[in-house]
Amino acid sequence: MTPDDIPQSGLGTGPATSPVLAEARASGPRRGLALVVLVALGAMLLWLGLTLPEGGAVARLGLILGGAVALTGAEAMRRATRYALILTDRALLEVDADGQPGRVLATLDGIAAVERGTFAMKPSNGFLLRLEQPAGRVWAPGLWWRMGRRIGVGGVLSAPQTKAMAQIIEFRLAGGDPRD
């Protein structure tokens, strides 16, 4: 799939008439809360690591490293959740705020199944895709991850939007056309 096959802005059609079937964006309050929690955790761990009078050097170093990891994770989530996910009739992909295409998560032809049950190993407010072929590991905190044949979509995304997206993918896998 090339960028010419993907819609170039918001909802509508792109140069190759690839209509957007569904769109999922990070929910503002969930995104804000997740970032506040990660930054607060990172700051608290750093503060404890730097000011704790008792405890060994290893414990203090562990707290400092934990704080740095939490702050790095918060920044990674801030960057990742600027993107939205769109489902076209060909693929599930990222788009930035201007509608410019980013990474392709999976083509619809490469999806074997959708798992969205209560006990599915999926992100919060999301679903899990099983792919036909394994792909590289990628993690966009709060938005999606991919490991081998599995893609987890969700986190700070809006639950109704991800549910609709999962239902459309399931319908397409069953041979239906959601535009009918």
Q: Which residues does each predicted region cover?
A:
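Short, conserved beta-turn/loop elements at beta-strand boundaries and strand-helix junctions
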Residues: 116-120
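A short, structural micro-pattern
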Residues: 86, 123, 145-147
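Conserved beta-hairpin
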Residues: 66-115
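A membrane-cytosol interface segment of integral membrane proteins
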Residues: 129-180
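Hydrophobic alpha-helical transmembrane segments
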Residues: 53-67
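N-terminal membrane-targeting/pre-transmembrane regions
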Residues: 1-55, 150, 180
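Short amphipathic alpha-helical segments, especially helix-boundary/capping motifs
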Residues: 21-22, 47-50, 65-68, 140-143
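Short aromatic-glycine-enriched beta-strand elements
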Residues: 124-128
